[in-house]
Design a protein with these regions (language model features):
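Conserved Rossmann-like nucleotide-cofactor binding loop
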Residues: 15, 38, 275
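N-terminal Rossmann-like FAD-binding beta1-loop-alpha1 element of flavoenzymes
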Residues: 5-32
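Glycine-rich FAD pyrophosphate-binding loop
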Residues: 24-50
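Active-site/ligand-binding neighborhood in enzyme catalytic cores
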Residues: 136-245
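Dinucleotide-binding Rossmann-like beta1-alpha1 core, especially the glycine-rich loop
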Residues: 52-137, 146-147
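Mid-domain catalytic core of redox enzymes
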Residues: 26, 241-357, 362-368, 384, ...
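Conserved flavin/dinucleotide-binding core of flavoenzymes
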Residues: 105, 317-493
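General small-molecule cofactor/ligand-binding pocket signal
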Residues: 85-86, 236-240, 396-397, 426
Length: 493
């Protein structure tokens, strides 16, 4: 191209930020359009007043796992040593009336990490191990992505767990928690995605299930610095304004905005949430053929989830973990002691001699009574932290959202991918298909980089490296063991 190429990135979440960064760093003139007043998408933070003091709120705690290589590459643009992330030493999982598991102190080398977890976990007994379906368990080691996604098409996470015959405690604590982290009911969530997570966190990497968190709210620690970095690269950030339409302008594409303006560019990256993406594609009848458009339109949204942040006038007990996953506590899925890791919340708690506690409830049934839900969440919190029963709530923030993509049991190949039928338009986000065993924030970042790379390749410009855990199982003996197991069954029968 004999002039500077141009791009519009629609969406200022992780996917859009990665795409904008990838394009701008190669000299592309980028306009970034974001509907909210702050960057970060579903991982943004915004200011609130808590009992007269300035503090922040977000859509809830997010774990920055060590396997999030491509997200971390994005964060290194403004924080080369990742000093704004703080390690969380443990990720305890508690089952009501029963066991607690931990991922701290495990060996780093697979499969020793998994073996050590099983050996020390109170949720596994020798009798339980004897009941485990050996072939289904070995299949977790015998993976090859993206083929494994296809192999599990039509099977839910719940069905995969049923096949494994893990003990109930381990099923709830070690695996079902994963499905609900996608805000999904395990009966609706993809079994292939569950297997991919098992590979990523246990069997395909040494980082395990320990993670980091930002030292302060998301805007302060992550996205505001990245926004300034983008502006230093010449990116024009337009917010808050929604993109409402896509226009075919011969060699270029126009993006219509709700204020009546149109931004025109050589290429467009659609890095929005799922429903805005579906609306933009529906408005652009020229984009793609009918089968592709149907694939986009048929994507489903995960059930609603609730986040309840409570500012108490008393501290929670000493030693409260920053993050606690739960199972069997009614609708309560996890509890975060926000003041244990977020600087703004910590300042508030020190000043008031109080605490800031956040409750999450995922995969809410349709028609959930929010008032009744709040009562039940508070009752379950009392079971875990009876000391707050005497505390006064001096401020609270309650939100319910239902805008996360559902990674369901449909065939993997039916999910929209980064490239569209029109070379000028790409997609990015945590609901967009890619070959790698990645998920959530890392899938958003990865597809954002991929979208940028797709356009850069057309212009003959250098793309950006992508990293992932190994795409295949790391244990060559496993396929032979599975064949031997199958042969022994045939002989016995």
């Amino acid at each position: 191209m004999d002039r500077q190429p141009t791009a519009v990135v629609v969406g200022g979440g992780i996917a859009g930020l990665a795409a904008a960064t990838g394009l701008a760093e190669r000299g592309v003139a980028v306009t970034l359009v974001e509907a909210a007043p702050r960057l970060g998408g579903r991982v943004r933070a915004w200011p609130v007043q808590a009992d007269g003091s300035a503090t922040t709120m977000s859509r809830g705690f997010h774990a920055f796992f060590r396997q999030y290589y491509n997200l971390r590459a994005l964060l290194r643009r403004t924080d080369p040593t990742l000093s704004r992330l703080r390690a969380v030493r443990d990720y305890p999982l508690v089952l009501a009336g029963g066991h607690t598991d931990s991922f701290a102190g495990l060996p780093t080398r697979p499969p020793l990490n998994l073996m050590a977890f099983v050996a020390r976990s109170p949720t596994f007994t020798l009798r339980d191990l004897a009941r485990v379906n050996a072939d289904a368990a070995l299949a977790l080691l015998d993976v090859s992505f993206p083929r494994t996604y296809e192999d599990y098409a039509g099977r839910s996470a719940a069905e995969v767990l049923d096949e494994l015959r893990f003990p109930d405690g381990a099923r709830h604590l070690a695996l079902e928690v994963f499905a609900r982290s996608f805000f999904a009911d395990p009966r609706e969530f993809s079994g292939g995605e569950l297997v991919a997570m098992f590979h990523t966190y246990f069997l395909g990497s040494a980082e395990g299930l320990l993670f980091d968190v930002p030292y302060d709210d998301y805007d302060t620690a992550l996205w505001a610095p990245l926004g300034r970095h983008l502006e230093s690269l010449g990116v024009r950030v337009v917010m808050p304004v929604k993109a409402t339409a896509l226009e075919d302008r011969r060699e270029r594409v126009g993006v219509g905005l709700e204020d009546g303006a149109t931004v025109e560019a050589d290429v467009v990256v659609l890095a929005t949430d799922q429903e805005p993406l579906q609306g933009l594609v529906a408005s652009a009848e020229w984009l793609g053929n009918e089968p592709w458009r149907m694939r986009v339109a048929e994507r489903r949204t995960a059930p609603a989830f609730a986040v309840w942040r409570l500012w108490f006038d008393r501290p929670v007990r000493e030693g409260t973990p920053p993050f606690l996953a739960t199972s069997g506590f009614g609708p309560l899925d996890n509890v975060s002691a926000v003041h244990r890791f977020e600087a703004g919340a910590a300042r508030w708690a020190r000043t008031r001699r109080g605490s800031v506690v956040e409750l999450h409830a995922y995969a809410l049934p349709d028609g959930t009574d929010e008032a009744a839900l709040r009562v039940e969440l508070r009752n379950q919190l009392r079971e875990l932290h009876p000391e707050v029963d005497r505390a006064t709530v001096v401020h609270e923030e309650w939100l319910v959202r239902d805008d996360c993509p559902l990674i369901g049991t449909e065939p993997w190949a039916d999910r929209p991918e980064v490239r569209t039928p029109d070379l000028r338009v790409t997609l990015a986000g945590d609901g967009i298909r890619c070959d790698y065993p990645v998920a959530l924030m890392e899938r958003a970042a990865t597809t954002g980089w991929m979208a940028a790379n797709a356009h850069l390749a057309r212009w003959g410009l250098r793309g950006h490296e992508l990293w992932t855990v190994p795409m295949d199982g790391r244990h060559r003996v496993v396929p032979h063991l599975r064949r031997a197991l199958s042969s022994s069954r045939l002989t016995l029968s």
